[in-house]
Amino acid sequence: MKGTITGIFILLITALSGTAQQGEGVAKAEQELINLSKEKWQWMADKNVDKLAALFHEKSKFVHMSGTWNKKEELDIIKTGSIWYKKADVHDVAVELEDNLAIVWNRITLTAFVRGNDVVTEFTVTEVYKKQSSDWKLLALTFSSVRDTHKIQH
């Protein structure tokens, strides 16, 4: 009887340990994506198209208030300054993971130079990433204009 109880106890501890490690892995991946998203905003502000080209998936799409563009078009917009993402103040971030896909929501105030003017707009930005080998690639980025009281549900 003691052997059975000890065996069950060991199985329970092993199962709980595995769940804790899995939870730590998810938290690590979430933090990695939060950091990557923040870096992306800085690369956009710096017009660092080399770093962005490596991040953007070949089939990526970018949805803005005035249109939808592919990877090449988005990089051209950034490089030429047609839209200059000067500063993204990130107020909140939420991440959801499912296998090799991740969705990152950013609640931001974006200062951008557009059509000759500086504009400040509140957005919730939805980013979809896909894990390829050991790297996350941005598949889609969508800007949704929102009120400044909008909250991301966690």
Model-assigned labels for residue ranges:
Residues Q21-A54, K59-H154:
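A beta-strand edge to alpha-helix "cap/lid" segment located at domain peripheries
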Residues G7-S17:
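Bacterial N-terminal signal peptides
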Residues M1-G7:
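Positively charged n-region of N-terminal signal peptides that target proteins for export
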